[in-house]
């Protein structure tokens, strides 16, 4: 079972991640929400995590198209939980498997998506999107690396785990 598998694994905390809302910049809803917009530089340097940065009211995106990851994906689960916690039902136009695909489709202006700050800190800057902080604790998670307990850990893996991922 999945629960007993957890005890058969070892893990390493990779990083904390926070989901953000990525909205195509040409959506008119953005003009009414400028005080909530976060520059990509503040996402990359972590300043957006400050409690002084306000979360966007999700209901403002009520009639907009959303790109959501499937519910067997943690990001997809969290996106739906965030929506439920905010009494909001997204109008879903795409259900996808990967954050990167959702990001690329959002860049094309085809919908709003939930995206992690780890991905945003590693992709080239795209001026076609506007970013917003999400409300609640469901937008925050810890990312782990897992491996089977008792398995040989190669020198390459040891060195990889020592790398600074910030």
Spans of model-derived segments:
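Short hydrophobic/charged patches on amphipathic alpha-helices used for structural packing
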Residues: 11, 58, 102-103
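Hydrophobic hinge/microswitch elements
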Residues: 71-130
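Secondary-structure junction motif
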Residues: 29-31, 36-86, 153-155, 161
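Short, small-residue-biased leader/transition segments that mark boundaries at the very start
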Residues: 2-7
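A late-sequence structural motif
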Residues: 58, 117-119, 128-166
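Short Pro/Gly-enriched coil loops immediately N-terminal to beta-strands
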Residues: 11-27, 34-44, 61, 134-142
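Short hydrophobic segments within beta-strands
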Residues: 22, 67-69, 146
């Amino acid at each position: 079972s999945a629960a007993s598998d957890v005890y058969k694994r070892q893990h390493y905390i990779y990083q904390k991640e926070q989901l953000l809302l990525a909205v195509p910049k040409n959506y008119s809803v953005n003009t009414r929400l400028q005080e909530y917009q976060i520059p990509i530089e503040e996402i990359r340097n972590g300043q957006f995590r400050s409690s002084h940065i306000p979360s966007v009211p999700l209901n403002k995106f009520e009639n907009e198209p959303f790109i959501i990851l499937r519910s067997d994906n943690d990001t997809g689960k969290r996106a739906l939980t965030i929506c439920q916690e905010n009494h909001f039902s997204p109008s879903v136009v795409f259900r996808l498997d990967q954050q990167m695909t959702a990001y690329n489709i959002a860049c094309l202006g085809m919908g709003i998506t939930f995206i992690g700050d780890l991905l945003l800190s590693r992709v080239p800057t795209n001026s076609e999107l506007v970013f917003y902080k999400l409300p609640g604790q469901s937008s925050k998670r810890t990312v782990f690396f897992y491996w089977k307990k008792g398995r040989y850990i190669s020198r390459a893996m040891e060195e990889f785990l020592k790398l600074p991922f910030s």
